[in-house]
C-alpha cells in the first residue's frame, strides 16, 4: 500500500513538472529590497488581466516547491511567500507558478535582503521614495504593511523616525493614522529619510518590520511668468560710433518669448544697425527654470540711441516682465587722472628723496651760495668765531708735523680765505701772557662750531683726555652752550677705544669727516668732497663779494712750513 502511494505521488510530481515546463514565462522588473533579520512577505505579482489559479512557489530553478510548513523559516502560507525571518543569504530568484485546468504562468521575481549600514537604522538600498507638494498637507505611506494585519484585520502600531531619531507625533506638525504619517503644511524643512517601525507576532514570536522612506518635496505647480535676471533698469556708458552687445538674460520656460524694443518698436529684421540673436539653455532638473538669452547686436552707436532706452520684454501666457538699459555718453574718469597724478607725485617724491640723499651736501651748499643773500638778515647771535679748532699739540720746540701744517696753514687757507669763515686757533689767535683757561673758555663760547682734529698716532690721543683745553672746550660744547662738534680725521683711525668717552659719543652720533690722500701735495680747493663736507657742517656764512677762492700752491706750502710757528702745548 505504501509503495502504491509513493508511486502515485511520484506520478503527480512528474505530471506537474511536465505541466510547468509548458508554462508561460514572465519576469517581474521591480526588485524589492528589504531589511535582513526581519519578517518579510512576498506576494505573487499577478496583473489584473492574468488568470487566477493555484499558486506554488519555487526557489531558483528547483523543481521542488517551497515548503508549506509554517515552522519552516522560508515557507508558503496561503498564496504568499514568507521569510521568518529573512537572511542576507536568502537573496536570489524565486518563482511563483499559477495553474488552473487550462492555464499555467511562471513569474520570476528577484528578492534582496540587506543589513543596516554602520551608524544608521537602515540601508540605502532599501529606501522607498515618496513625494509630496509643498504648502499643503500630505501623507507618507509605510509600504507593504497590509500583509501583517491581525485576526481583527487591524494593522500593527507604527513608530516613526526621521533620520533615525524618534519623531514627535504632536498632531500639529505630524500625526499617525494607521499606516500613514500625516505631514501638516509640507515645507522644504520636512525633507529627509523617515523610518516606520513595527512588531508582528507570528506563531507566538515577535519579529521586527522596518521600512525607510525618502521624503522629497515638490514645488507648487503654480503658473509662473518669466523673470528677467539682467538687465536691471540700468545705464551704460558707451562711446559714439562704438560697437556693443546688449544681453537680456531670462529665467522661464523654453516656450517663453524674449525680445528687445527701442522707442516703442520691436527690432526690424532688416535693420542695418540693430540685430537680435536668441539662445536657450534647458534645465533638466526643472524645465520651468530654463534660461533664455536674447542678444541685441548694435554695429554702430548713433546719437539717436542716447534719446530712448533699449527695453527687453519676456512674456508667456501667465504674464510679462520688462527691463531697460539707457545708453549715456561716457563721463570723464577723474579717478584715473587722480591715480596717475598720485603715481607721478609718488615717483617724483621718491626720486627727489633719493637724489637729495646722494647730493644733499651739494644741494645745501648751492642753496647757501645762491639764495642766502636774498634771505632776511637774522639778528646777531653774539658769536665772534665760526669755529674753534681743537688739535693735538706738537711736543718739542721747532718741530712741525703734518697736523700743524693742516691746522695753521691749510685750514685758514681754505675756510678763511676761500670760504670767508673766521677761525680761532689756539697758538695763533691768543696773546702772550694771557691766562690759558680764561682764553679757552672765553673763545669757545664765542665760537659757533668746535672742530676737533684727530690723528692716528696713539700718542696723539693722550692730549684729548688730560689737557685743560680739551676739557674746557668739550664742557662748553656738550654741556653748557650746546655747540655743534665736527670731527676731522687726518688719517684712518681703526680703533676709538682709547679715545675719551665724549669723542666716542660724538663719533657714534654724528660720525667723522676723513681726509683721503696727502694734503701737502697739490693745491687745495673748497670745491673738493672733503671740504664740501666740512662746509656743510659749518654755519651759514654771508661771504663778502670781494672774496675769491684761492688755491694752496706747492711753493706756498713750502713757505708756510718755513714760517710755521707752533707754540708748545
UniProtKB/Swiss-Prot annotation:
Catalytic activities: NAD(+) + H2O = ADP-D-ribose + nicotinamide + H(+)
Task: Mention any Pfam family matching this sequence.
Answer: Ig_2
Which top-level enzyme class is recorded in the Swiss-Prot or TrEMBL entry?
hydrolase
The positions making up the signal sequence are 1-17
Which residues belong to any copy of the Ig-like C2-type domain?
23-110, 118-210, 226-328
Q: Where is the composition biased (Basic and acidic residues)?
A: 556-569
Report the outcome of residue 131 to H: No effect on interaction with IL1RN
**Per its UniProt record, what SMART domains does this chain match?**
IG, TIR
Per the record, what is the consequence of mutating residue 369 to A?
Reduces NF-kappa-B activation
Cytoplasmic compartment ranges equal 357-569
Q: SUPFAM superfamilies attached here?
A: Immunoglobulin, Toll/Interleukin receptor TIR domain
Q: What are the disulphide bonds in this sequence?
A: 23-104, 44-96, 121-164, 142-196, 248-312
Instruction: Name any GO cellular component annotation.
Output: cell surface
In terms of PANTHER family, this protein maps to: INTERLEUKIN-1 RECEPTOR FAMILY MEMBER, INTERLEUKIN-1 RECEPTOR TYPE 1
**Entry's disease:** Chronic recurrent multifocal osteomyelitis 3: An autosomal dominant autoinflammatory bone disease characterized by early-childhood onset of bone pain and arthritis caused by sterile osteomyelitis.
Q: What is this protein called?
A: Interleukin-1 receptor type 1
This protein's species is Homo sapiens
Amino acid at each position: 500500500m505504501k509503495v502504491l502511494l509513493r508511486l502515485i505521488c511520484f506520478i503527480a510530481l512528474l505530471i506537474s513538472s511536465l505541466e510547468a515546463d509548458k508554462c508561460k514565462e514572465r519576469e517581474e522588473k521591480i526588485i524589492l529590497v528589504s531589511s535582513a533579520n526581519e519578517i518579510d512577505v512576498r506576494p505573487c505579482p499577478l496583473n489584473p488581466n492574468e488568470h487566477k489559479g493555484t499558486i506554488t512557489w519555487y526557489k531558483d530553478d528547483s523543481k521542488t516547491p517551497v515548503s508549506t510548513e509554517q515552522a519552516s523559516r522560508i515557507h508558503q502560507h496561503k498564496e504568499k511567500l514568507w521569510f521568518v525571518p529573512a537572511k542576507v543569504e536568502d537573496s536570489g530568484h524565486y518563482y511563483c507558478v499559477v495553474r488552473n485546468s487550462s492555464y499555467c504562468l511562471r513569474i520570476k521575481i528577484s528578492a534582496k535582503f540587506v543589513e543596516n549600514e554602520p551608524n544608521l537604522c537602515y540601508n540605502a538600498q532599501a529606501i522607498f521614495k515618496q513625494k509630496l507638494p509643498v504648502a499643503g498637507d500630505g501623507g507618507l505611506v509605510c509600504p507593504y504593511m497590509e500583509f501583517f494585519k491581525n485576526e481583527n484585520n487591524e494593522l500593527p502600531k507604527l513608530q516613526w523616525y526621521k533620520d533615525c531619531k524618534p519623531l514627535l507625533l504632536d498632531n500639529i506638525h505630524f500625526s499617525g493614522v494607521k499606516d500613514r504619517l500625516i505631514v501638516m503644511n509640507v515645507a522644504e524643512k520636512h525633507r529627509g529619510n523617515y523610518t516606520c517601525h513595527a512588531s508582528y507576532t507570528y506563531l507566538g514570536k515577535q519579529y521586527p518590520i522596518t521600512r525607510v522612506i525618502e521624503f522629497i518635496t515638490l514645488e507648487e505647480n503654480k503658473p509662473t511668468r518669466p523673470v528677467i535676471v539682467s538687465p536691471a533698469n540700468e545705464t551704460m556708458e558707451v562711446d559714439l560710433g562704438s560697437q556693443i552687445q546688449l544681453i537680456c538674460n531670462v529665467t522661464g520656460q523654453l516656450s517663453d518669448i524674449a525680445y528687445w524694443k527701442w522707442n516703442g518698436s520691436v527690432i526690424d529684421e532688416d535693420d542695418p544697425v540693430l540685430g537680435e540673436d536668441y539662445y536657450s539653455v534647458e534645465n533638466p532638473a526643472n524645465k520651468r527654470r530654463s534660461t533664455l538669452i536674447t542678444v541685441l547686436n548694435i554695429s554702430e552707436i548713433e546719437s539717436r540711441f542716447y534719446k530712448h532706452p533699449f527695453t527687453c520684454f519676456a512674456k508667456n501666457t501667465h504674464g510679462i516682465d520688462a527691463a531697460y538699459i539707457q545708453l549715456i555718453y561716457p563721463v570723464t574718469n577723474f579717478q584715473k587722472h587722480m591715480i596717475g597724478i598720485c603715481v607721478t607725485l609718488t615717483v617724483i617724491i621718491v626720486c627727489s628723496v633719493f637724489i637729495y640723499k646722494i647730493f644733499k651736501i651739494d644741494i645745501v651748499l648751492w642753496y647757501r651760495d645762491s639764495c642766502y643773500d636774498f634771505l632776511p638778515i637774522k639778528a646777531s647771535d653774539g658769536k665772534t668765531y665760526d669755529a674753534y679748532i681743537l688739535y693735538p699739540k706738537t711736543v718739542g720746540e721747532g718741530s712741525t708735523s703734518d697736523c700743524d701744517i693742516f691746522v695753521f696753514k691749510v685750514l685758514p687757507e681754505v675756510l678763511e680765505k676761500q670760504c670767508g669763515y673766521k677761525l680761532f686757533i689756539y697758538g695763533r689767535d691768543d696773546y702772550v701772557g694771557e691766562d690759558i683757561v680764561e682764553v679757552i673758555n672765553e673763545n669757545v663760547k664765542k665760537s659757533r662750531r668746535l672742530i676737533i682734529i684727530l690723528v692716528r698716532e696713539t700718542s696723539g690721543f693722550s692730549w684729548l683726555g688730560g689737557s685743560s683745553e680739551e676739557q674746557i672746550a668739550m664742557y662748553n660744547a656738550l654741556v653748557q652752550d650746546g655747540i655743534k662738534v665736527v670731527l676731522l680725521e687726518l688719517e684712518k683711525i681703526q680703533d676709538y677705544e682709547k679715545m675719551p668717552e665724549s669723542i666716542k659719543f660724538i663719533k657714534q652720533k654724528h660720525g667723522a669727516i676723513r681726509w683721503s690722500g696727502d694734503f701737502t701735495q697739490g693745491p687745495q680747493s673748497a670745491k673738493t668732497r672733503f671740504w664740501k663736507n666740512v662746509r656743510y657742517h659749518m654755519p651759514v656764512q654771508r661771504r663778502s663779494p670781494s672774496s675769491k677762492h684761492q688755491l694752496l700752491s706747492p711753493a706756498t706750502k713750502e713757505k708756510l712750513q718755513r714760517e710755521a710757528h707752533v707754540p708748545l702745548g
